[in-house]
Amino acid sequence: MLAAAHGAVLVPTVPPTYQALRQEVDRLGNAEARMCFYLSALFTATDQIQRYLSAGIPVVVESYFARCLANHRAFGANLSVSLPQGLPRPITYYLACAESERQRRLARRDKPVSRWDALAEINADKITDAYASFPMHRVTTTGLTPDEVLQAVLSTDPQGEQASADTQHVAAHPHLLPSVPRRTEGAYGA
C-alpha cells in the first residue's frame, strides 16, 4: 500500500533466490548464522535498491538493517557489525500499537508460528528497546485500519523531529542509518 501511494517499487529484503535457503537457515537454531544470512540477503537487496534509486525510482521495503540487527541481538547473536558507507539511507517508520492490539493482530495471522516468531515474542521488550536506538518515526496504529495506518504514515513529516529516536548524531554510531536521505547526485554511482 505504501509503495503504491508513493509510486514506488516494493523490494523484498529477502530476494527470491534466497527463499529456499531461508527455510533451511530458519530451521537451524544458530542466531549468528541466521543473522549473517539475513545480512547477506539485505546487502543483495541493497544492490537492487540502489539501481532503482539511481534511476530515480523510489523504493519501499518492509524491513531493513535496523530490524535485522535489533532482532538478532535480542535472539542472542553476539556479532559486531559495522555497516559500510554508501548504503541507501531509509526514512524508517516504527509502527506501534497497544499490547492488547498487538496480541489480537498476532492471533489473526494466517501463518504457522516459527521458533523465531516464538523467540521474538519472548524477547519482544528487548527488540523494542533495540529499536529505540535507531532513528525512526513512531506511528501509533492502535485501532486503525490498514488504510488509516497508511494515512498516518503519509501524514508523518519525514524530516521532522522523531520523538522516539536517539538524538545522537547518526554518523557517530556505526550501526545506524540516518532517517533522511543525504545523497548528492552521483554519490552512489550509476
Where do the PLM segments sit?
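Positions that flank functional sites
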Residues: 16-18, 67-68, 146
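Short, flexible loop segments at the rims of nucleotide/cofactor-binding pockets, characterized by
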Residues: 35-40, 70-72, 115-117
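Conserved substrate/cofactor phosphate-moiety recognition/catalytic segment
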Residues: 2-47
